[in-house]
UniProtKB/Swiss-Prot annotation:
It comes from Methanobrevibacter smithii (strain ATCC 35061 / DSM 861 / OCM 144 / PS). Keywords: Cytoplasm, Ribosome biogenesis, rRNA processing, S-adenosyl-L-methionine, Transferase. GO terms for molecular function: 18S rRNA aminocarboxypropyltransferase activity; S-adenosyl-L-methionine binding. The keyword Transferase applies. GO terms for cellular component: cytoplasm. The keyword S-adenosyl-L-methionine applies. This is 16S rRNA aminocarboxypropyltransferase. Coiled coil: none annotated. PANTHER family: 18S RRNA AMINOCARBOXYPROPYLTRANSFERASE (PTHR20426:SF0), RIBOSOME BIOGENESIS PROTEIN TSR3 HOMOLOG (PTHR20426). It is an enzyme of class 2 (transferase). Its main location: cytoplasm.
Length: 171
């Protein structure tokens, strides 16, 4: 499974999950947006379409691309988001990384990539990419029911419906 991460050099390198992923041989870091593979699914928190099983073939053929930047600076990374026609956002999930533990939707790069792989039914790869992170298994355990429901949804609209039903049940 091809995983590429555009690294914006805005993070604390000691806590950076994409740098650790690269050291573990689980992704390729790029620092130039022109090095991002065309046709890959690009994770984009501003995308109108949620990742779903209908993205399976794009992830399988071209991979997934994460953006590693500060959540405080993500809106300034808009240039990154013009690179692919397969921009996808992630549905509601809860972070378990040490920096944002328990915060909804503020995922680390490795959590976002893992969630994308899980939702597109690359579940073994989703688990594997979290190996090497002490808290990695916690992400899948805490979000298990949602990830399963999202992975069973065939389309982006179905994923959004599952998300909305979950959020409404919590009100």
């Amino acid at each position: 499974m091809k995983v590429t991460v555009f690294h914006a050099n805005e993070c604390d390198r000691k806590k950076c999950t994409s740098i650790k992923m690269e050291k573990l041989g689980k992704c390729k870091l790029v620092y130039n947006i022109n090095k991002i593979p065309s046709g890959a699914v690009v994770l984009n928190p501003f995308a109108q379409k949620a990742v779903s099983y209908e993205d399976y073939r794009y992830v399988h053929r071209r991979g997934v691309v994460g953006l590693d930047c500060s959540w405080n600076e993500v809106s300034s990374s808009k240039k990154f988001f013009s690179l692919s026609k397969y921009h996808r956002s992630l549905p509601f999930l809860i972070a378990t990384n040490p920096v944002n533990y328990g915060k909804p939707c503020i995922l680390s790069t490795v959590e976002a990539v893992s969630a994308t792989l899980y939702i597109t039914r690359f579940k073994d790869e989703a688990k594997d990419i979290l190996d090497g992170f002490k808290w990695g298994h916690t992400f899948l355990e805490l979000n298990h029911d949602l990830l399963e429901a999202y992975s069973e949804a065939d389309t982006s609209k179905d994923v959004v419906r599952v998300q909305n039903e979950f959020l409404e049940s919590k009100e």
